Regions:
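Short glycine-enriched nucleophile-adjacent loop
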Residues: 178-187
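Alpha/beta hydrolase fold serine-hydrolase catalytic domain that processes acyl esters and thioesters
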Residues: 3-14, 22, 26-34, 40-76, ...
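Active-site-adjacent helix-turn-beta-strand microarchitecture at beta-sheet edges
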Residues: 87
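Gly/Ala-rich beta-loop-alpha elbow adjacent to hydrolase catalytic centers
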Residues: 169-174, 178
Length: 368
């Protein structure tokens, strides 16, 4: 009877749109440099934001000024963002030795929930880490280990009796890090409820076999949401059945004043921004759709060659793919033994394409 008139306030978690906005703004200078946002809110980020290119001449997440204005307006017009407090920003490690392209990990508090978010691939350090993730002898990588250490530290520091739920999220490599944490800590931490990964790549066979029990226990808590034309979520093997695709829209960004055009066009297709639709200058996540045929073909092909290539060929292949997006000091981030193709690699590679084409109906050599 004491509780007859008592109604517990049920607070809804952040929406998918709000999580995607957070993952988008992690690419901005305000999160990448310094600690000035710690103790402030996401709405404060909007007030302090200044549009600028990074040291390599990139837009933040390949989002141009016109597009970023819509991100700002979205944050301004939703009062939820003024209630999301930024507890911690870790940007102390960089993707290049000169300090550019920081690796960013952020902890946020909203009502009685903690959100731990991870930015996507940063510089040569993490592109090399992506290639190493494909090695059959790799169980987990240095970047995944560091993400787990950050999560553990934040969990210990901020998850007390007042916190009811914890969520992990990230875009691209950050999405993979958040999935990794859900697998490793999902059974141990009952408050860790969900992982929301955006365009996160998969895992190698060794990891999936070693952690098969943990994956089975936690895969229903992992959501991987990707753009229909995204080329990162197709890499390696996905560990969740909760894979959603949303319609992507991109104008490839503005190319004016750009130095790294190839990186920019690649980046524009993979940017978190492509998953938004706009109405009256305010952004929401776009409609659900199917994965594009081209990306489905790429996914099948990557799985085929990983299964059929020699170990040395596959290691070279993944380092070669990663190196496209390493913009400087390449020799530091590509092991010496994988800077040149193994003898006969291209002949074998063309044979793989031919054999894959025979196995898959309605796929042309040109598509591959």
């Amino acid at each position: 009877r004491i509780f007859k008139n008592f109604k517990e306030k049920i607070v809804k978690r952040l929406t998918i749109t709000q999580l995607l906005i957070i993952n988008t703004i992690l690419y901005t200078t305000e999160f990448n440099v310094g600690q000035k946002l710690v103790g402030k809110t996401v709405r404060d980020w909007e007030k302090e934001f200044k549009f600028e290119l990074d040291s390599l001449g990139h837009f933040p997440a390949e989002i141009n000024e016109t597009e970023m204005e819509k991100v700002l307006k979205t944050v301004r017009e939703d009062e939820t963002y003024s209630k999301i407090k930024i507890l911690d920003v870790n940007n102390s490690k960089s993707g290049y030795t000169d300090g550019s392209e920081p690796i960013v990990m952020v902890t946020l508090k909203y009502e009685d929930m903690i959100y731990i978010a991870f930015k996507g691939t940063a510089g040569g350090v993490e592109w090399k880490d992506n290639a190493i993730a494909a090695y059959p002898e790799t169980i987990y990588t240095e970047a995944q280990k560091e993400a787990l250490e950050y999560y553990d530290k934040m969990y210990e520091k901020y998850v007390d009796n007042t916190i009811k739920k914890v969520y992990v999220t990230g875009h691209s490599k950050g999405g993979n890090k958040s999935q990794f944490i859900m697998v490793i800590r999902g059974s141990k931490h009952s408050k860790l409820k969900r992982c929301f990964s955006f365009c996160g790549q998969g895992f190698n066979k060794t990891f999936i076999e070693k952690y098969s029990n943990q994956i089975q226990e936690n895969k229903d808590k992992i959501y991987n949401i990707s753009a229909d034309n995204d080329y990162v979520n197709v890499i390696l093997t996905q560990i969740t059945d909760k894979i959603k695709f949303v319609k992507s829209t991109t104008n490839m960004g503005e190319v004016a004043k750009k130095r790294a055009i190839i990186r920019h066009k690649f980046g524009a297709l993979h940017s978190p921004y492509v998953m938004f639709k706009e109405k009256n200058g305010v952004l929401t996540i776009n409609v659900k759709t199917k994965q594009s045929k081209l990306m489905r073909t790429l996914q099948l092909f990557l799985a085929y060659i990983l299964e059929n290539m020699t170990i040395e060929d596959s290691k070279y292949f993944y380092h070669a793919m990663s190196s496209i997006l390493i913009e400087k000091e390449k020799e530091k981030y590509i092991p010496e033994e994988y800077r040149e193709a193994p003898s006969g690699f291209y002949r074998r590679f063309i044979t793989h394409i031919y054999n894959f084409q025979k196995e898959e109906d309605n796929i042309s050599f040109v598509q591959i």
